[in-house]
Amino acid sequence: MRYLHKIELELNRLTSRYPFFKKIAFDAEIIKLVDDLNVDENVKCAIVAIDTSMRMQDFINEDNKDSFVLSTDVLSALFYKYLSQPFYQHDFLVLTDCVSRINELKSIRATITDEIALHNINKQIHYMFIQPYMNNEKVVSYE
């Protein structure tokens, strides 16, 4: 779990450096799954950073938009930083595809009222960044 310590240190530095930067807790279930992935530590950091950023977007409102938008942008920047040192092209393509897919699903989710369909979409969104790496297999698309 060195990766988790690494990202927590980075976020603590950002919090002390930028007063508007806000942290939200990492998703405990996602952390547990990331722990078991057979990928580089930086890829694990990237997954946690982008997962947290995308979840944080769901909490943005008029009262917190200044700090939360900044925070999601900073977390997204960390995502790109972790994937660039060294450059993990395959993981970059897989995970940026996941970001696009989550944005599509969130748009679809806004139009759905059926509870079962909403549950299924929320489940897909929740596991999106982990799914490509489950069972030590990299899956590029969700078609």
UniProtKB/Swiss-Prot annotation:
Function: Catalyzes the condensation of three molecules of isopentenyl diphosphate with farnesyl diphosphate (FPP) to yield (all-E)-hexaprenyl diphosphate (HexPP; C30), the precursor of the prenyl side chain of menaquinone-6. Large subunit Hexs-B catalyzes the condensation reaction and the final product chain length is cooperatively regulated by both the Hexs-A and Hexs-B subunits using the whole size of the hydrophobic cleft as a ruler.
Cross-referenced NCBIfam families: HxpDPsynsmall (NF045627)
Protein name per Swiss-Prot or TrEMBL: Hexaprenyl-diphosphate synthase small subunit ((2E,6E)-farnesyl-diphosphate specific)
UniProt KW Nucleus keyword: no
Catalysis: reaction(s): 3 isopentenyl diphosphate + (2E,6E)-farnesyl diphosphate = all-trans-hexaprenyl diphosphate + 3 diphosphate
Source superkingdom: Bacteria
An example molecular function term from Gene Ontology annotations: magnesium ion binding
Lineage: Bacteria, Bacillati, Actinomycetota, Actinomycetes, Micrococcales
One family name in Pfam for this protein: HexPS-like
Enzyme class: transferase
GO biological process, one term: menaquinone biosynthetic process
EC number of this enzyme: 2.5.1.83
Keywords (A to Z) from UniProt: Menaquinone biosynthesis, Transferase
Keyword Transferase annotated: yes
Complex formation: Dimer of heterodimer or heterotetramer composed of a small (Hexs-a) and large (Hexs-B) subunit.
